[in-house]
């Protein structure tokens, strides 16, 4: 019995020393951060939604030279996923409207012709979407 108590206390001390040895501050080096956007389209609306993405959203991203990484799924829950690079890392999340999003908006207005028309197209796209979510990711490669 005493041997078991000693063994358990020793195990706890070893675990705690390991836990605290890992508690020192450590920063990710050379991390590139992405906002990852997942989209599931309504039944029968995938083609329309993808046409809007290709015609307007991709064009605006090219105009501002933002290197997005889009993927279309063959299987699984989602239809479309895009990795949007956060040029200023996680600091970009501090903005209500980031400088990149402001440039994107201006590029879309320039391409489409007016803010009202951009809003209409955005609403048309939103009407194609059944659900969406966004997550943060990073890579150090």
Predicted regions and their residues:
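Bacterial N-terminal signal peptides that target proteins for export
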Residues: 1-10
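Intrinsic structural disorder/low-complexity segments
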Residues: 10-11, 25
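Hydrophobic h-region of N-terminal signal peptides that target proteins for export
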Residues: 13-22
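Short S/T/G/P-rich N-terminal loop/turn motif that feeds into the first structured element of a domain
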Residues: 21-141
């Amino acid at each position: 019995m005493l041997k078991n108590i000693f063994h358990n206390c020793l195990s706890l001390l070893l675990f705690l020393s390991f836990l605290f040895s890992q508690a020192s501050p450590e920063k990710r080096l050379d991390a590139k951060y992405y906002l990852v956007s997942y989209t599931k389209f309504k039944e029968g609306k995938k083609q329309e939604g993808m046409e809007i993405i290709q015609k307007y959203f991709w064009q605006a991203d090219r105009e501002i030279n933002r290197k997005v990484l889009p993927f279309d799924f063959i299987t699984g829950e989602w239809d479309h996923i895009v990795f949007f690079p956060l040029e200023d890392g996680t600091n970009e999340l501090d903005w209500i409207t980031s400088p990149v999003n402001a440039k994107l908006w201006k590029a879309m207005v320039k391409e489409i012709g007016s803010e009202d028309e951009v809003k209409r197209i955005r609403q048309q796209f939103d009407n194609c979407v059944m659900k969406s979510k966004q997550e943060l990711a990073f890579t150090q490669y």
